[in-house]
Amino acid sequence: MLRSLAENFCTPAEVLTKLNHLLVEDFPSGRFVTMVYAVLDPGKGTLTYASAGHLPPLLVDSSGARFLETEMGLPLGIRHGSFSEATVELPERFRIALYSDGITEATNPEDEEYGTARLATHVQRPDACPDTLLGDVRSFANGTGLRDDATVIMLCRK
């Protein structure tokens, strides 16, 4: 479904709006999904993205780490609506992390969350990749297990 929409609609906001329309019609009451939809344009050096109730992308460059601003929007499948998008110009070297709340909300035995600060610190490491981040989250959880899905995608240009 997403692939078909991506081929027929131009922007992340349009794709999320159409996908949401389809899911509102099909999802049982109380069901929803969050996501960030992003389009990387290497030729222009930009990332255009829209959020449906999902956490913001994390951009790391030579100046450090920052969470990309955008309207979060409602999760998909709740009610009809539209989404906004933002475009960021990417530096020559960067790393972008897209991640689920299972990463930031993972807890240790003291019930402390992994959080966004630890996420940003880890993603700034030169060796950071999805495997090292997931390993760090599991190590932080110290045997308590993960209560939610822990998903991460990283895009890099070095």
Predicted stretch roles:
Residues 3-158:
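Conserved subregion of the PPM/PP2C metallophosphatase catalytic domain
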